């Protein structure tokens, strides 16, 4: 009888707790969170708002200096799941994840520390690491689970997808399902698996055309430099950090093959040859490789990204041996030029090994999504041990691979896996 009474009391308590669910406005008011602005709504959501959450710069010293972290809340109903989108970079624009749209549920998008509005007044580089960022996300999950007690799904694209992995590596109980898109797991500041990938991706004919263009652009760089300079001046790009305009030009040519396969914007039949005008060569190269990537303007804005790549997340470089006889300026294949020598860049080689071990032995409920031809698939997660997790490669896919542009059958497989993890 006593057991029945206790069970009944527990049910009443749970029912009262359910009745006590507060509105979004009440929750924000209780937590002292101020709305920055309301975004134009979509029919899916009751409201979409931007708010700022106070976070310690150093979570090991919670009473020390703090910064405000930007998040977007897309609210439907507390009884529905939440998709947490980890931006990885700034979150200067809002978007609805395709998973959120599929589930018609709540969404929280989180801007990464040291980017956009989530940049501290002082840049203490030692506090820009994967644990600090994961703890930012842990604090947000812990806070908003009071409002949204149902299942949580974390997802992100590219570096945002890496952020998903690191968050669950440090805090495996925070979310129920993880969906990283096109997220590499790199094992060094120059992961040489990239070179092997570029030697085998696509068809031999297409690879030859890509390499032929690079050799032409380097061998005849004197013919194209004026057009490169004119284009850069028009865009407002400067290249002091890279080492000057001539060096930047060579880096752009070296980047061409990586970017060509990463994005898949231009078919090989559109690659220009020697007969093309200098301006056409430069326009094409910019469309594929993006000259802004080596500009002072880009490097300064995205220096937090380069710091993470060069200290924990790993990155890529260029196989200079292939083009050695054509290079006049570049002799460093990696991106250490993005920082002054006064900033210590020491790479933590053990972290990626530990993350891979976690994915092999402990991780569950992951859905990894990659594009077959995306250069970042060279360092994709391909080993998950006996986990129930799933890995999907879209045939011929690029870094733009998403669930909704997969073939119908594969798309159904992804959403079937997602549904099984949520039930």
Question: Where would I find each of the regions flagged by the language model?
Answer:
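Bacterial Sec-dependent N-terminal signal peptides
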Residues: 1-23, 198-206
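Catalytic-loop region of hydrolases
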Residues: 19-106, 407-409, 416, 420-423
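Conserved alpha/beta-hydrolase
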Residues: 100-119
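Alpha/beta-hydrolase active-site loop
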Residues: 127-146
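Alpha/beta-hydrolase fold nucleophile elbow
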Residues: 148-158
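Glycine-rich nucleophile elbow surrounding the catalytic serine of serine-hydrolase chemistry
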Residues: 156-166
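Alpha/beta-hydrolase
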Residues: 166-305
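C-terminal subdomain of alpha/beta-hydrolase-fold enzymes, centered on the catalytic histidine
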Residues: 260-423
């Amino acid at each position: 009888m006593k057991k029945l009474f206790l069970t009944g009391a527990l049910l009443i308590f749970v029912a009262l707790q359910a009745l006590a669910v507060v509105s979004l406005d009440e929750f924000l008011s209780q937590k002292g969170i101020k709305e920055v602005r309301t975004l134009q709504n979509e029919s899916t959501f009751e409201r979409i708002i931007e708010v700022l959450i106070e976070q310690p710069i150093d979570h090991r010293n919670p009473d020390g200096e703090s910064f405000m972290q930007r998040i977007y809340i897309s609210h439907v109903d507390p009884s529905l799941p939440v998709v947490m989108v980890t931006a990885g970079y700034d979150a200067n624009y809002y978007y609805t994840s395709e998973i959120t749209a599929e589930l018609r549920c709540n969404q929280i998008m989180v801007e990464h520390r040291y980017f956009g509005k989530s940049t501290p007044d002082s840049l203490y580089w030692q506090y820009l690491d994967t644990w600090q960022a994961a703890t930012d996300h842990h604090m947000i999950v812990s806070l908003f689970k009071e409002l949204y007690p149902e299942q949580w799904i974390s997802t992100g694209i590219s570096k945002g997808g890496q952020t998903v992995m690191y968050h669950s590596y440090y805090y495996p109980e925070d979310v129920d399902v993880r969906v990283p898109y096109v997220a590499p797991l790199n094992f060094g500041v120059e992961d040489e698996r990239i070179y092997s990938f570029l030697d085998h991706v696509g068809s031999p004919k297409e690879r030859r055309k890509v390499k032929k263009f690079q050799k032409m652009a380097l061998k005849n760089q004197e013919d194209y430099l004026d057009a490169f300079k004119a284009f850069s001046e028009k865009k407002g790009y400067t290249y002091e950090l890279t080492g000057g305009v001539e060096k930047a030009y060579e880096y752009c040519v070296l980047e061409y093959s990586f970017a060509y396969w990463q994005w898949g914007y231009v078919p090989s039949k559109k690659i220009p040859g020697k007969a093309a005008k200098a301006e056409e060569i430069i326009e094409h190269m910019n469309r594929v490789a993006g000259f802004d990537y080596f500009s002072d303007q880009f490097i300064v804005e995205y220096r937090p990204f380069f710091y993470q790549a060069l200290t924990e997340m790993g990155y890529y470089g260029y196989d200079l041996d292939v083009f050695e006889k054509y290079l006049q300026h570049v002799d460093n294949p990696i991106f250490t030029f993005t920082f002054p020598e006064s900033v210590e860049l020491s790479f933590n080689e053990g972290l990626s090994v530990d993350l891979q071990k976690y994915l092999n032995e402990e991780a569950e409920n992951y859905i990894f999504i990659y594009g077959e031809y995306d250069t970042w698939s060279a360092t994709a997660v391909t080993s998950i041990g006996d986990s129930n997790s799933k890995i999907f490669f879209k045939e011929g896919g690029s870094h733009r691979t998403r669930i909704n542009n997969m073939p119908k059958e594969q798309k159904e497989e992804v959403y079937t896996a997602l549904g099984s993890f949520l039930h």
